[in-house]
Amino acid sequence: MSRDQGSTEYDANQRQEQHQEQHNTSYTHTDVRTNIPNIPAPFISTGVSGLGQQLVGEGFTASAARISGQSSETHVQMTPEMEAEARKDRERYERELQAINERHQRDIEGKTEAYRKQAEQEAERLRKELEKQHQRDIEFRKSLVQGTIENQKRQVELEAQLAKRELDREARLATQALDQSKMATDVQVNFDSAVGHTVSGATTVSQSEKVTQSKH
């Protein structure tokens, strides 16, 4: 495409965009046409095109390419003000990016600290629960030992009671045996005494008869 054809197409597009059509209403409108001067399209340098691609993407780059293709005579360089503006934009971008990263880091630290505290609280709760369980185990074993001791104590008491009753029975048996032995001894003594008295009486009688016979 030649430069004249490109310029003509550009002028036609500009006229079509700025043309005000007449609407079908009850009012009268006047079409206004403005004569557009034939100004060569500017040429965007590679640096500006690259910055435009970073900021707005491929669309701006394509538009810049179309514009730059229309003229090869006009070159537009970034002014110091534009460079300062771009530098400020870059600095603002760096600050905002740093702020985003710092907020993200603080968020991570906050969540980590909250999780750590929660984990510590849970660990402390588990530790106390384990201590309680250990104390319950001790009390359980103590209860078993005390129960065993009480059981053995009751068994010993029962055996002692049984032994005492056995001793009481043996004592009664011994008493009964002693009483029976004493009664047998008394009978023998009485019997022996009775026999001796009878013999003595007989002798007496015999002597008396002898004495009587002598007197006669």
From Swiss-Prot:
Q: Which UniProt keywords apply?
A: Coiled coil, Cytoplasm, Repeat, Stress response
Highest taxon of source? Eukaryota
Localization recorded for this chain is:
Cytoplasm
Where is it mostly found? Answer: cytoplasm
| Region listing for CAHS motif 1, in residue ranges | 115-133
Coiled-coil residues are 81-180
Keyword Coiled coil (UniProt): yes
> Where are the residues of the annotated region CAHS motif 2?
152-170
Listed Basic and acidic residues bias regions: 12-22
Q: Where is the composition biased (Polar residues)?
A: 1-11, 25-34, 68-77
Q: Where is this region: Disordered?
A: 1-34, 66-91
Q: Does the keyword Repeat apply?
A: yes
One Gene Ontology cellular component: cytoplasm
Family, as annotated:
Belongs to the Cytosolic-abundant heat soluble protein (CAHS) family.
Instruction: Quote the function comment for this protein.
Output: CAHS proteins are cytosolic heat soluble proteins that seem to contribute to the anhydrobiosis in tardigrades, but their specific mechanisms are yet to be identified. It is possible that protection during anhydrobiosis might occur via the stabilization of vitrifying small molecules such as sugars, but not via the direct glass transition of CAHS proteins themselves.
Question: What domain comment accompanies this record?
Answer: CAHS proteins contain 2 repeats of 19-mer peptides designated as CAHS-motifs that comprise each two octapeptides connected by a tripeptide.
- Other remarks on this protein: Trehalose, a disaccharide essential for several organisms to survive drying, is detected at low levels or not at all in some tardigrade species, indicating that tardigrades possess potentially novel mechanisms for surviving desiccation involving tardigrade-specific intrinsically disordered proteins (TDPs).
The name on file for this protein is Cytosolic-abundant heat soluble protein 2
Gene that codes for this? CAHS2
